[in-house]
Amino acid sequence: MIAASLPEAQRARVHYVAVRDYYDDGLWADSVRRKVADAVPASRVALVACFKDATSYYLHHFPQWTMLNQEIDAGAPIGATAIRKVLFEAEDVDVSLGALAQLLPKAIAQYLKAWTMLPWYAPLVQEHRAIEAYKTRWRTAPYAPIFCTVDALVQTGGHVLLVKRGGYPGKDLWALPGGFLEPRERLLQGTIRELAEETQLGVLAPTLEEALVGVAVFDHPDRSQRGRTITHAHHFNLQTSQLPEVSAADDAALAQWLPLASLPAMEEQFFEDHFHILNHFLKLTHEQR
């Protein structure tokens, strides 16, 4: 879309490099620096920056580059939030696209029109509406809520137990079994309860407690679009050759043992940062701190 909005003479001057998410600022910044160095070796680098709001903090991760700070024009809002709102919330897509045509370069408006005809658009509309409905329920709270969740990573026989989410947000995406902690629960107790509710795993709670090999907190402020959500992931290694029986229940559409070897190629199929939780415990990729 960026290339389509540029004059033809400028397109050859612009290079695009993909950088994956890490939910780890240090790893991400290191990756950006490597990718830039590979794309333009032995070059002076300037970072064209705009400190829009608190989410712009990452610009400070590159002190070795010359920063060219751009002032915000109050009359020209920066960001795609308003565009997403029009695209995902209007009752009539054609009307929405007509409104966006006044805000965007012609090539971008045409691209979005074609994109809304693809099979991914309708599920994203449902995803957006589910997230907005979730946030709306908490807007009357006297302060921004912070949610506490638990997740279970159960490993055995070269496999890991995962669920497919049955509803939005994250419908049909793979995830670790888990959910919100109840008021009178300890973290481990809540993890085992959620595991049983979603997978019907045929393993007794005392056996799971003995199989616990690791616990980690995942607290990146942007790890969930629903709001600030801090999860406590518990890693269980049953160390059995047989895979215990499982059956999806509660809000899981599917519960299944998946081979560890298949996980690295599935990163884009996971809900929120659940692939990164798996990577933390299982070292699925070579990019680790």
Label the predicted regions.
Residues 18, 49, 68-71, 162, ...:
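Structural signal for conserved beta-strand scaffold positions within catalytic alpha/beta enzyme cores
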Residues 131-176, 203:
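N-terminal strand-loop-strand
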Residues 49-53, 165-166, 232:
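Short, well-ordered beta-to-alpha junction loops that form the rim of enzyme active sites
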Residues 11, 42, 147, 155, ...:
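Short connector loops at helix/strand junctions that flank enzyme active sites
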Residues 2, 180-277:
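Unchanged
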Residues 25, 55-58, 77-79, 169-172, ...:
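Short catalytic/ligand-binding loop motif for oxyanion handling, primarily in non-cytosolic enzymes
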Residues 1-133:
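Nucleotidyltransferase catalytic core that binds NTPs
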